[in-house]
């Protein structure tokens, strides 16, 4: 294969509850993830034996490079790849742009390098890159628990959303570290839709 074009979608957290901080430093959460039609564009091109990233907005320690190198090393792939990344998803807005780019890179390279690996195994690899990267491997609206890797497909009718993107940037890590844990009514995947309708949270 000489070239493969991919679209990496953004996500919305329709509900996000940070449940508690874990002993491993991560946080347990309860959330509802859905994809929206806002995309980064990724192109994979044949390269000799190295991995090269060309990006529209340079990002230090890009997760796309980590994903590509990880897959190459795990499967002892001899071929290289040139990755062109054009960013449209705003950074540090909670839209999962970096995680989506990583997942799309893993999915694309599976096909590009003709690797025999299931979605489930690919999701386990994805988890080493970030807690919400596995969600983008499956690419369906899902209720997420644990770090975000315990996913249950959620029946949710397509809706339209209006996004407001303030100039303020907030890192996910800092936001989670400042979360306060106070008693509140628990929202679950069973009652989310009705609670949303009555604006109870």
Task: Label every PLM stretch briefly.
Residues 29-30, 99-100, 177-179:
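Short, glycine/charged-enriched secondary-structure capping and boundary segments
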Residues 136-138, 143-201:
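Conserved, helical-rich catalytic subdomain that frames metal- and/or nucleotide-binding sites
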Residues 93-123, 135:
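DPxDG-like acidic metal-binding loop motif
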Residues 1-93, 111, 115-120, 155-156, ...:
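ATP-binding N-lobe of GHMP and related small-molecule kinases
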């Amino acid at each position: 294969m000489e070239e493969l074009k991919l679209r990496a979608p953004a996500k919305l957290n329709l509900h996000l509850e940070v449940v508690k901080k874990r002993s491993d430093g991560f946080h347990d959460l309860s959330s509802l993830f859905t994809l929206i039609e806002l995309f980064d564009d990724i192109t994979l091109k044949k390269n000799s034996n190295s991995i090269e990233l060309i990006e529209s907005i340079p990002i230090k320690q890009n997760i796309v490079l980590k994903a590509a190198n990880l897959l190459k090393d795990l499967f002892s792939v001899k071929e290289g790849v040139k990755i062109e990344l054009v960013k449209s998803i705003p950074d540090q807005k909670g839209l999962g742009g970096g995680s989506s780019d990583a997942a799309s890179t893993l999915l694309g390279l599976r096909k590009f390098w003709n690797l025999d690996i299931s979605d489930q195994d690919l999701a386990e690899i994805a988890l080493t890159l970030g807690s919400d990267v596995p969600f983008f491997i499956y690419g369906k609206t899902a209720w997420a628990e644990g770090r975000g890797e315990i996913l249950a497909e959620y029946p949710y009718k397509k809706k339209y959303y209006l996004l407001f993107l303030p100039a303020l940037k907030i890192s996910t890590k800092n936001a989670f570290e400042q979360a306060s844990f106070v008693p509140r009514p628990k929202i679950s995947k069973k009652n989310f839709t009705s609670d949303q309708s009555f604006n109870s949270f």
